[in-house]
Swiss-Prot record:
Homodimer. The gene is dxs. It is an enzyme of class 2 (transferase). It catalyses: D-glyceraldehyde 3-phosphate + pyruvate + H(+) = 1-deoxy-D-xylulose 5-phosphate + CO2. This is 1-deoxy-D-xylulose-5-phosphate synthase. Mg(2+) binds at residues 149, 178. Thiamine diphosphate binds at residues 77, 118-120, 150-151, 178, 289, 372. One of its GO terms (biological process) is terpenoid biosynthetic process. Keywords: Isoprene biosynthesis, Magnesium, Metal-binding, Thiamine biosynthesis, Thiamine pyrophosphate, Transferase.
Length: 632
């Protein structure tokens, strides 16, 4: 470890770097790595991506002048070094905690965070907008999007590349190529980049030819200029064409992204170049920390706390399986008996626990990369051929495929089973990753069934019901983390479409809820019983369609009704119950909703966030007592 003279906690902005020589910059890099490893070992975070961009980030801030020059960090989880160099090292003990330092770029956090990210493949389009605004306003600054090879597989990135090349405006795109995104990359572009990584022969040959020609007296310069086409021919012979030059970029690289001097030199070349430039740098995810460097699965992409000395994770004893594992295990069981079942994931095989499925049924498993729109319509295509596709996708990423859900899946009433992972609050990743919008946007689509199980047994039953259903798409939501630990019975059963479960018969009032908030409702009902209130609890496992027969019986009791959901109130489950009440003219019933407000929910622990919005036994008890008092 280095002993750099500058205390990282005292950095206020990147201007100090301009006075450092290359050895001092390298010492700074070593200190930043040590700081990141120590800090994230306590808090957790995206350690792998950040260790890989230490030299790149230092070189960017050394070469350019932030915030006048604009850095846009695609996905944004690799912005920790940027945060350190822009004066936020002292806040790292609050990283991803409620009210603390955000794990992604945040405009309100620093003037150096010019664009907020969290989902992938957005940086290039944002950069196009900034470049156009700059030129219209006749301003002078550089726009530098930094995008990874994984994010570059997203369709939005290709759309932007096409536009950038066509515009021909000044822009410097940094391709941070570490041969991984969260999991190992897939797809044809990955193969193209692989060829470019090994094309040093071409780069050296091109440079040497140019130098030799320009040494020829008198005619040398002209000969070098007219030889460009010949050199392009050599390029095609050696690397079968460079994708980015065909799009209109000047391509620089590939270069070693951990060689500070080389990175700075190439950034200076890019600054002096007119038109769009793509600088292709090769980095090692997890650089400088052996457990992260050796990671081939994506385990060290983002972690909880860990022991620095051993690289072992500090986790509470795991006694039950995760929700993702429960769903994946049932998918495996079903697929073993039905060759029509196919699994699709957009770059999340590890998080969705589909690795075992991929090994067992390789011909029926498809990781399509960061391509949610393609994954969804691909599932629709499979369904037209009597296959049974299972689309495993995080709630926050399902947003990206809304049109495909509407136009390709639901409109055609195709039998696609959608496993909506990380549904509800996810905690530390904050605004960009909370899975709180899917109910609202799926509720508006005809032919869509939306469900959420209360425990592992019901998850299994809903999976079996979904694959037996043959009248359109069927979504199963499940949260991040572990289930409640319900043991599975020897055999499963199908649940009638739209049928809820009465767990406690309502007398004085009733709570309608589903998924993990059911446990909180039961605790609240127990507390209310101690107070002499007989409050029913209904497991509304079908969010759409509603159990209208049961709702009619409840409304006719004329007792207070409380809906509880870990999702947005606008367009949510409670809103659907209110619509039912209005449509059926139940005007003499008191009904209230507990859920998340019309705002983006920041990072922090899930229990703390839930408590702050009253989605807890305490909040439920208070609301029920308030409603009962009003109805007297």
């Amino acid at each position: 470890m280095s002993c750099f003279y500058l205390d990282l906690l005292k950095i206020k902005d990147p201007s100090f770097m301009k006075q450092l020589d290359i050895q001092e910059l390298e010492a700074l890099a070593a200190d930043i790595r040590a700081f990141l490893i120590t800090s994230t070992s306590k808090s957790g975070g995206h350690i792998g991506p950040n260790l890989g961009v230490v030299e790149l980030t230092i070189a960017l801030h050394y070469t350019f002048n932030s915030p006048n020059d604009k850095f846009i960090w695609d996905v944004g989880h690799q912005s920790y070094v940027h945060k350190i160099l822009t004066g936020r090292a002292s806040q790292f003990d609050t990283l991803r905690q409620h009210g603390g330092l955000d794990g992604f770029p945040k405009r309100k956090e620093s003037i150096h965070d010019v664009f907020e990210t969290g989902h992938s493949s957005t940086s290039l389009s944002a950069a196009v907008g900034m470049v156009i605004a700059r030129d219209i306003k006749k301003e002078d600054f550089y726009v530098i999007p930094i995008i990874g090879d994984g994010a570059l597989t997203g369709g939005m990135a290709f759309e932007a590349l096409n536009h950038i090349g066509d515009m021909g405006k000044d822009m410097i795109v940094i391709l941070n190529d570490n041969d991984m995104s969260i999991a190992p990359n897939v797809g044809a572009l990955h193969n193209v980049l692989g060829k470019l990584r090994t094309s040093n022969t071409f780069q050296q040959t091109k440079t040497n030819i140019d130098k030799l020609m320009r040494k020829i007296p008198t005619a040398g310069e002209k000969l070098a200029d007219t030889a460009e086409k010949a050199k392009d021919g050599i390029k095609h012979l050696l690397v079968e064409g460079t994708f980015f030059e065909e799009l209109g970029f000047m391509y620089l690289g590939p270069i070693d992204g951990h060689n500070l001097e080389d990175v700075i030199t190439n950034l200076e070349i890019a600054k002096r170049t007119k038109g769009p430039v793509l600088l292709h740098i090769i980095t090692k995810k997890g650089k400088g920390y052996q457990p992260a460097e050796l990671d081939s699965r994506g385990t060290w992409h983002g972690t909880g706390p860990y022991k620095v000395e051993t690289g072992s994770f500090i986790k509470p004893a795991k006694t039950v399986a995760s929700w993702s594992s429960v769903i994946s295990n049932e998918l495996m069981r079903l697929a073993a008996n039905d060759e029509r079942i196919v699994a699709i994931t957009p770059a999340m095989p590890v998080g969705s626990k589909l690795e075992k499925f991929a090994k067992t049924f390789p011909e029926r498993f498809f990781d399509v990369g960061i391509a949610e729109q393609h994954a969804t319509t691909m599932a629709a295509g499979l369904a037209t051929q009597a296959m049974k596709p299972f689309l495993a996708i995080y709630s926050t990423f399902l947003q990206r495929a809304y049109d495909q859900l509407v136009h390709d899946v639901c409109r055609q009433k195709l039998n696609v089973v959608i496993g909506i992972d990380r549904a509800g609050l996810v905690g530390a990743d904050g605004e960009t990753h909370q899975g709180i919008f899917d109910i609202s946007f799926l509720n508006s689509i005809p032919n869509m069934i939306i469900t959420m199980p209360k425990d592992e047994e019901e998850a299994r039953q809903l999976m079996d019901t979904a694959f037996a259903y043959d009248d359109g798409p069927f979504a199963i939501r499940y949260p991040r983390g572990n289930g409640p630990g319900k043991e599975l019975s020897e055999s499963s059963k199908l649940i009638p479409i739209g049928e809820w479960e009465t767990i406690i018969q309502p007398v004085d009032a009733v709570i309608l809820t589903f998924g993990p908030t059911l446990e909180q409702a039961l605790k609240a009902a127990e507390q209310l019983e101690d107070l002499g209130q007989r409050v029913g609890v209904i497991n509304a496992r079908f969010i759409k369609p509603l159990d209208e027969a049961l709702l009619h019986r409840i409304f006719k009791q004329k007792i207070p009704i409380l809906t509880v959901e870990e999702s947005l109130l606008k367009g949510g489950f409670g809103a659907s119950v209110l619509e039912f009440m209005e449509e059926n003219n139940y005007t003499d019933v008191t009904i209230h909703r507990i859920g998340l407000p019309d705002e983006f929910i920041g990072h922090g622990s899930v229990p703390l966030i839930l408590e702050s919005y009253g989605i807890s036994p305490t909040g439920i008890v208070l609301k029920i007592n308030e409603m009962l008092a009003q109805s007297e």
